[in-house]
């Protein structure tokens, strides 16, 4: 006859936080192994693409990481993707160029 298995925690319902797997112990007993929930991948604030180089962890594990494991060595590392940062830099450069051109045209018209 099959061995009966009961939950090992007080929560008796099949909820998202109470997911289990059946395992066999070295003593040949069958037990429930409680499975931790998966972490979500951090995403870029501008484009929404997953950020590379940053682990997908639950909030508590993520808070335990050291500072350099939570980010990438770049401007806006850990917040924006590389392409989003590149686009911001190019846009800022073009805006500055446009301001300079506008000033030059104003000076030319005053002469």
From Swiss-Prot:
Other known facts: There are 2 genes for eL34 in S.pombe.
Q: Highest taxon of the source?
A: Eukaryota
Gene Ontology biological process terms from the UniProt entry: cytoplasmic translation; ribosome biogenesis
What PANTHER family does UniProt report for this protein, alphabetically? 60S RIBOSOMAL PROTEIN L34
Q: Which residues carry this modification: Phosphotyrosine?
A: 76
Task: From the Swiss-Prot or TrEMBL record, state where the protein is found.
Answer: Cytoplasm; Nucleus, Nucleolus
Name of the protein in its database record: Large ribosomal subunit protein eL34B
Query: Family assignment?
Result: Belongs to the eukaryotic ribosomal protein eL34 family.
What does the entry list under GO cellular component? cytosol; cytosolic large ribosomal subunit; nucleolus; preribosome
What is the role of the protein in this entry?
Component of the ribosome, a large ribonucleoprotein complex responsible for the synthesis of proteins in the cell. The small ribosomal subunit (SSU) binds messenger RNAs (mRNAs) and translates the encoded message by selecting cognate aminoacyl-transfer RNA (tRNA) molecules. The large subunit (LSU) contains the ribosomal catalytic site termed the peptidyl transferase center (PTC), which catalyzes the formation of peptide bonds, thereby polymerizing the amino acids delivered by tRNAs into a polypeptide chain.
Q: Which keywords are on file for this protein?
A: Cytoplasm, Nucleus, Phosphoprotein, Ribonucleoprotein, Ribosomal protein
Give the quaternary structure.
Component of the large ribosomal subunit (LSU). Mature yeast ribosomes consist of a small (40S) and a large (60S) subunit. The 40S small subunit contains 1 molecule of ribosomal RNA (18S rRNA) and at least 33 different proteins. The large 60S subunit contains 3 rRNA molecules (25S, 5.8S and 5S rRNA) and at least 46 different proteins.
Q: Quick one: which gene encodes this?
A: rpl3402
Task: Please give one Gene Ontology molecular function term for this protein.
Answer: structural constituent of ribosome
Q: Which InterPro entries match?
A: Ribosomal_eL34 (IPR008195), Ribosomal_eL34_C_sf (IPR038562), Ribosomal_eL34_CS (IPR018065)
Q: Which Gene3D superfamilies match?
A: 6.20.340.10, 6.20.370.70
Q: Where are the transmembrane segments?
A: none
